Amino acid sequence: MIQVASKILVTCALPYANGSLHLGHMLEHIQADIWVRYQRIRGKQVYFICADDAHGTPIMLKAKQSGITPEAMINKINQEHQTDLAQFEISYDNYYSTHSDENRELVISIYNTLKENGLIKKRMISQLYDPIHNIFLPDRFVKGYCPRCKLPDQYGDNCEICGATYHPTDLIDPKSTLSGVTPVISKSKHLFFDLPVFSEVLRAWTRSGALQEQVANKMQEWFDMGLQQWDISRDAPYFGFEVPDTPGKYFYVWLDAPIGYIGAFKNLCNKRNDIIFDEFWHLSSKADLYHFIGKDITYFHGIFWPAILEGSKLRKPTNLFVHGYVTINGAKMSKSRGTLIKASTYLAHLDASYLRYYYATKLSSDINDIDLNFNDFVNRVNADIINKVINLAARNASFIQKYFDNKLSATIEDQYLYDYFVTASVSIGEAFNNRETSRAIREIMILADRANVYIHKKEPWVVAKNKYYQQDLHNICSMGINLFRLLMTYLQPVLPNLAIQAEAFLNTKLNWDSMVIPLTNHKISPFKTLLQRITLSQVKAMIDATH
């Protein structure tokens, strides 16, 4: 059971500002949002922040290719990202950018602190340089033969076939992906963060028991291999923050990106007067700090980032919540197969609630990959949300409206069943709190099945035919509406927009603390369709639009 402080700062990994969000990105934002919404519902003071990762060579080159400035491009992308996230009902308190005054000041301040503490080293390195474009080539802008397995077409940092990691200069027959020419080797003096100094601090943090077992085991592998000094500088031309008193040198994006968490929170504090910055980032902070991230960036967040914080005399994360990748119909996302689906393309064809629910049925606290199978997606959403939950309200509301002027009865027909549903809040709440979202959904759907069995056995459509059993009909259907209310209370973190519609129908707020008291002698609103069924033709249209 995760013990959560009363004050919490939650972040998602920063989307890179050179392209659109896709359904892979949305997994993390939805997972974090469900957890954040649950914590808020249970009375925690939560601040949920994110930002665009807006620096680096890829952004500089793409902007140049598009004939615009990097600033213009990242501003456009930022607006697009914020629109997509809002339509997916992601409840950020602040969504910002790493290209900000707050972040620049923080990066320079942290760098100066590290430098004063003797943690910044200088040394000469050899780099690959494109003589056509006059640019030092980042790892992902050079390809060649893997130095270990000798297979071709591998990037400059690691082999996707054998898993080897290496320096770009180790590639056999390297070629620039920009010009296709063989790059030349050029020397340059770079700045390095003395990461090995923090080996024991990081080992202790890893052994604290807070991290997922798979994550802790992976970090132990890195410790066993030995930590290396970290190159935190890049040569001009580069889009980012220039290193003070070092002309032509810029901070590497992976230094200023995680500091962007602090920058985004600082910006939120500047916009409000009710948040004390030091309560969340000071070394003595009693607040919790959680980073939701994908498993591909565990090294940066589990090794590099806490070391930077330790060296800067700032607090370390309480925990990293790491998730796996999204596959589509069992395979990696692919542009050619039409499965690298943009968030905006999805939203043009389908309601955000569908994906929020489907991801929730798959999410757990481990780092296994999650498959978005479209046949299962359609069947699961229709069976669970439409058939079991919404139809429960629709069937009973029709009788309440027709015979009882939309007013619920004065008594609960089955108090034992109602209490059983309320008692389930303990286990369901524990599952949400521990990020075992799929378990929470399973338990909620077991309740939904039981509610529908209750209605099926009571047969209100038969009872309605006998005018002498009007009170029974009233009690049965009022019970059905009350069970719907409890189901929607539990689903509120997963389906916030549907929950708002349910509140309008029920004419009351959904509240975990007050649900022990049923709705009796209570006027509800006329029932309106809350959500439509999905069809495979809608999914096909979405995929066709992706090609």
Curated annotation (Swiss-Prot):
GO terms for molecular function: ATP binding; metal ion binding; methionine-tRNA ligase activity. It holds the Pfam family tRNA-synt_1g. It is an enzyme of class 6 (ligase). GO terms for biological process: methionyl-tRNA aminoacylation. ATP binds at K335. It comes from the Bacteria. CDD domains: Anticodon_Ia_Met, MetRS_core. GO terms for cellular component: cytosol. Is required not only for elongation of protein synthesis but also for the initiation of all mRNA translation through initiator tRNA(fMet) aminoacylation. This is Methionine--tRNA ligase.
